[in-house]
Design a protein with these regions (language model features):
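Conserved GNAT acetyl-CoA-binding A-motif
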Residues: 137-142, 167-178
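Conserved beta-strand in the GNAT
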Residues: 53, 59-68, 130, 140-145
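C-terminal "cap" of GNAT-fold acetyltransferases
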Residues: 173-184, 193-194, 200-213
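Conserved acyl-donor/pantetheine-binding loop and adjacent beta-alpha core of acyl/acetyltransferases
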Residues: 72-138
Length: 213
């Protein structure tokens, strides 16, 4: 029987292993367990973030994490990268060919900026959103994954149900996400769950779903 629970620090290794099994070819997985665990730990380091998982007889089979922005400039991608910078550096030191991985090349500007912040000790200061853009009532779905052995068995729908419930409890009126344009399976699943397209490029699709609170 599937069970839902908020993820604790002690449960991060199992959630990270589920993440790596769900995305075996991703850059984060190639960096190793230490990086995957640390990047997911970012969701436990702030009140405006959350992480939960689904288990089947004690085994983690799916997970989901969200982020509620407090203003412009406090993005989840940069935050996770900076939080797990040491683990990323160690992973790339052991596998230097990852410096030429397509995902690393794409994030070179962001990586350089985060390294600079790490050296200088400066923090990314959020700017309060201008009138007309209410980021605080919007929550982003940042990470979600289902173990390959449990796809098509209702785990994804359960994750989406609890994500939506968590967003409502945080008084959000809108949920957002970004998905790769090539991830057809995920796009179909999101649309089936009521998500709509808001923007589209050759590489990614931005989606949203409004909430009745």
């Amino acid at each position: 029987m599937f069970q839902h629970s908020a993820t604790s620090l002690q449960q991060l290794p199992e959630v990270a292993r589920c993440h790596m099994a769900s995305f075996p070819d991703s850059f984060g997985t190639k960096l190793g367990l230490a990086y995957s665990k640390k990047s997911l730990q970012w969701f436990l380091a702030g009140e405006n973030r959350f992480l939960f998982h689904i288990t089947d007889e004690g085994r983690v089979i799916g997970y989901c994490g969200g982020f509620q922005s407090t203003g412009l400039g406090d993005g989840s991608t940069s935050g996770m990268m900076q939080y797990a910078m040491n683990e990323a550096a160690m992973g790339m030191f052991r596998k230097p060919w990852l410096f030429f991985h397509k995902d690393v090349i794409r994030f070179y500007p962001l990586i350089i900026k985060n390294i600079s912040r790490k050296i200088t000790g400066s923090k990314n200061t959020a700017v309060i959103s201008p009138g007309g853009i209410n980021l605080i009532t919007s929550i982003g779905l940042v990470v979600i994954g289902v173990h390959p052995a449990y796809r098509g068995k209702g785990c994804f729908e359960l994750l989406m149900h609890h994500f939506e419930k968590e967003c409502k409890e945080r008084n959000a009126t809108k949920m957002t996400l970004s998905v790769k344009s090539s991830n057809t399976r995920a796009i179909v699943a999101y649309k089936k769950a009521g998500w709509l397209n808001t923007a589209e490029t050759a590489k990614a699709i931005e989606m949203y779903k409004t909430l009745d609170v």
